[in-house]
Amino acid sequence: MSKSKNNVINPLDLVEEFDPEVIKYYLLAKISINNDGVFSNELLKNTYNSELANTIGNLISRTIAMIKKNFDQPVKFVQTDDKNDLLAIASIVKNTKEFQLHFDEFAIDQAFDRMINLAKSLNKYIDLTTPWLLTNNLDRLEIILNILLNGIYAIATMLEIIMPQKVQIIKEVLNLNELNFDLIFDFRKFDEIVVNEMMPLFLRK
């Protein structure tokens, strides 16, 4: 990117198309502070659609929609020995710890790679457990949706570092005033919370 090649990006034009928090996400999550990075409108758009809209946004939208459709009371944590449940719980714990480790070492891009990895694993968990087919088995559905809620909490806690305004919307949906890394590992935190309806968080571009 240089003036001589006439490929300089005007930041004022950029913020007309993208939320400033989205731009900040790309700069911190996709570019290493230790190496040169590549930036273009196309890469920014692809990252936004792939990671924020498709991976994180769809995860939250699907989970909240299934909760609001099937429950009017808190979705509580229940002990489980199901393999897919245990793998999802392990993914929440593992990716959170690795996020914290990378962040403490200033490997910000690697930290947020763990966040996206967690979101992808939870989307896979949805595909494997097919909760939309469990409307006649609410006990099983509750287990799955609580695990997903806990995963969303972890993702929101990580994402708040870069996108506090967007995460404020998530907190309102989750009916929470604040997020805390220590609470990620407490899977009973939603036992007395009724979540709220939500609108799409990240609209595709």
Where are these regions (language model features)?
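Catalytic adenosine-cofactor/nucleotide-binding cores of aminoacyl-tRNA synthetases and other
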Residues: M1-L86, N177-N196, P200
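Residue-level signal for cytosolic alpha-helical hairpin/rod architecture
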Residues: V8, N41, V93-K97, I152
